[in-house]
Amino acid sequence: AVIGNVSVTDPDAGDTHTYSVDDARFEVVGGVLRLVAGQSLDFETEPSVSVIITATDAGGLSYNEAFTVTVTNVNEAPTDIALSNSSLAENTDTTGGLAVGNLSTTDDDAGDTFSYAVVGGADAAVFSISGNQLVITDGVLDFETKNSYVVDVEVTDQGGAGLTFTKSFTVTVTNVNEAPTVLALSNSNLDENVAAGTTVGNFSTTDADTGDTFTYNLVAGVGDTDNAAFTIVGDQLQINASPDFESQSSYDIRVRTTDADGLSTEQTFTVTINDLNEAPTVLSLSNSNLDENVVAGTTVGNFSTTDADTGDTFTYNLVAGVGDTDNAAFTIV
């Protein structure tokens, strides 16, 4: 860059002169003071430069003088954008628009003013600018659904047309542990007469937080009437004693599931006992005495049956086996 012409006053007419500069960034070539190739001056760090130029004539005599080179400021483009905050907690409600953080700009020109605009990025549609704030509007944030947003912001230097800088930002959603929402039991029916310790079913938990672990407990509360009849081992519900449909056909229990951070939900369950047809246990005859000489076909007595299954009907037959010696003398009607 040419700065200016250098001339010297010398009483010796026709003398020739060479020039040197005490600052290596400058040189005098052909009587012109200029910057050495590859050098530049920065107004913001050095608004003026003092140089000493020495003129030497052909006879070796010299003269020097100090000059001040004034650096003229040129508006420069911004070089960076910063965002004061780039993370938001899960469950934050952004429905009405929420400021993520404040935008600031790095620019060599002190005192410059700037404007900002959303110009791109995968999630540009949910962002806007308010003053120097980056604003998001995307309802209630859910880490499990979307854990980060990408937006491109452009800053424009108000002091000069076309002086801009663009930067991409990633706004992250931080996970917040949420309580379990649903407790389920894989099976709630059990045949009567199964052995004590039989597994009814397995518990499972629905939770928005992927990878959570859970513990299960029988707890007091509405619907806990028959908690004492069961034990939970791991995620298995086991019955403590062999159930009998005729004694109790269903059981009510209350269970709590708790995640690793102590958040929980409770659910009541009804375990239904399936009725199984059981064999009769007692066969009785209402009378077993008969007078001699009664007519053939006289009724000796009536059979009745004891059976755990209420309402069962029965048929009766004479059968072969121990004690059947006189079966042929009787008929069952």
Q: Which stretches of residues belong to each language-model region?
A:
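Acidic, turn/loop-rich segments in luminal/extracellular domains of secretory-pathway
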Residues: 1, 6-8, 12-81, 85-183, ...
